[in-house]
A protein has these predicted regions:
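Flexible, solvent-exposed loop/hinge segments and secondary-structure transition points
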Residues: 2-202
């Protein structure tokens, strides 16, 4: 009986030590992971809006996100949300445009989160990806310039995906074999553009 109790105590101590060690490792790795994610996010922001020196929050615009959520959901862009909005600033701290992040849950592989840059005049400066888990060689091609750069330089408008070749300024050529991904990304862009037009450009 004493042997059984002794073995149980030893097992408990080993389990306790292992749990403490795992918890410590988790805590140690949390900060580097967060730093890496923040670095990647900053790099995407800079890619989307290269003219900006920094980005800053605007409390009024942040509050407008929740207020506009229902209206954006009713626009037919799919299951999309606007997640955040930041002002794009020049070296003097002047606002030169905006960076809006949005998410579509209708990607083939799950949610897709993007960042959209817009100038003060309503021209798209670019589209970048913050999170995407689509099929390699198909939906992941959304990250390639051939697809995402179709939005750059265009004025704020509602975009649509076409599989027959873009004939109008608001048409976006679908990725071959990845129409679902193409529509999800375009829906997220449309949500960001709508927020800009409804809450910023007014």
């Amino acid at each position: 009986m004493k042997g059984i109790i002794k073995d149980a105590v030893i097992l408990f101590i080993i389990t306790l030590i292992a749990g403490v060690c795992l918890g410590a490792v988790h805590e140690i790795t949390l900060e580097p992971i967060a730093q890496a994610q923040e670095k990647a996010r900053t790099a995407t922001y800079q890619e989307v809006y290269p003219e900006a020196v920094s980005f800053g929050e605007n409390a009024e615009l942040t509050q407008a996100i929740a207020a506009s959520a229902q209206e954006i959901a009713s626009q037919g862009f799919g299951n999309v949300t606007v997640d955040s909005v930041q002002e794009a600033l020049d070296a003097s701290g002047n606002v030169i445009g905006y960076l809006i992040t949005s998410t579509s849950t209708e990607g083939y592989g799950g949610s897709i989160q993007i960042a959209v840059g817009l100038t003060g005049e309503g021209t798209l400066t670019g589209v970048g990806f913050l999170s995407i888990s689509e099929t390699a060689g198909l939906g992941m091609n959304a990250q390639k310039p051939e697809f995402k750069d179709q939005f750059s330089g265009k004025t704020a408008q509602t975009f649509e995906v076409t599989k027959t070749g873009a004939m109008a300024d608001n048409q976006i050529n679908a990725i071959s074999g990845a129409t679902i991904t193409s529509k999800a990304v375009t829906g997220a862009v449309n949500a960001a553009v709508y927020f800009y037009e409804d809450c910023i450009a007014q």
